[in-house]
């Protein structure tokens, strides 16, 4: 679920940036998304959105699905239980690792999505 995703982000980035910093970044980080991602971090968010869409096609509710995971050496590790839990956990873990590797550009936070995300 989204709270677990937030915790995974903290695991992967070693607590270096609050999870909320990603909530209004670029064209895809946060609710919804459209247009072309503005940078590598925004691409991570688009991939995560697409992964959640795939989970939805499988009948899963990724924003609400609780799953089991551990933080081992700043790497989120999923403990598979059911298809929906495993799929959702994998979406979140891959996104958290992607966020940790991608540069955060302050100029892409809280952008005007109407003009920049076409």
UniProtKB/Swiss-Prot annotation:
Requisite cofactors: Ca(2+)
What organism is this sequence from? Pseudechis australis
Q: Which PROSITE patterns match?
A: PA2_HIS
Q: What is its EC number?
A: 3.1.1.4
Catalytic activity line of the entry: a 1,2-diacyl-sn-glycero-3-phosphocholine + H2O = a 1-acyl-sn-glycero-3-phosphocholine + a fatty acid + H(+)
Q: Where is the active site?
A: 48, 92
Disulfide bridge map: 11-71, 27-117, 29-45, 44-98, 51-91, 60-84, 78-89
Q: Which GO terms describe its biological process?
A: arachidonate secretion; lipid catabolic process; phospholipid metabolic process
> Record's Pfam families?
Phospholip_A2_1
Instruction: Quote a single Gene Ontology cellular component term.
Output: extracellular region
Presence of the UniProt keyword Metal-binding in the record: yes
Q: Which InterPro entries match?
A: PLipase_A2 (IPR001211), PLipase_A2_dom (IPR016090), PLipase_A2_dom_sf (IPR036444), PLipase_A2_His_AS (IPR033113)
Molecular function terms from GO:
calcium ion binding; calcium-dependent phospholipase A2 activity; phospholipid binding
Tissues where this protein is expressed: Expressed by the venom gland.
Membrane spanning segments where?
A: none
Instruction: Give the family per the record.
Output: Belongs to the phospholipase A2 family. Group I subfamily. D49 sub-subfamily.
Keyword Calcium carried by entry: yes
> What SUPFAM superfamilies would the database entry show?
Phospholipase A2, PLA2
Q: Which residues bind Ca(2+)?
A: 28, 30, 32, 49
Q: What is this protein called?
A: Basic phospholipase A2 PA-5
> Where in the cell?
Secreted
Q: Which UniProt keywords apply?
A: Calcium, Disulfide bond, Hydrolase, Lipid degradation, Lipid metabolism, Metal-binding, Secreted
EC class? hydrolase
Q: What is the purpose of this protein? A: PLA2 catalyzes the calcium-dependent hydrolysis of the 2-acyl groups in 3-sn-phosphoglycerides.
């Amino acid at each position: 679920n989204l709270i677990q995703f937030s915790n995974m982000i903290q695991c992967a980035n070693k607590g270096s940036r609050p999870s909320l910093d990603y909530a209004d970044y670029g064209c895809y980080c946060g609710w919804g998304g459209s247009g072309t991602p503005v940078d590598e971090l925004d691409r991570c968010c688009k991939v995560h959105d697409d992964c959640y869409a795939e989970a939805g096609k499988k009948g899963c509710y990724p924003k609400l699905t609780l799953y089991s995971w551990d933080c081992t050496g700043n790497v989120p590790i999923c403990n598979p239980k059911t298809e929906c839990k495993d799929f959702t956990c994998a979406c979140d873990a891959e996104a958290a690792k992607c966020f940790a590797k991608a540069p955060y550009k302050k100029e892409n936070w809280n952008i005007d999505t109407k003009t920049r995300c076409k």
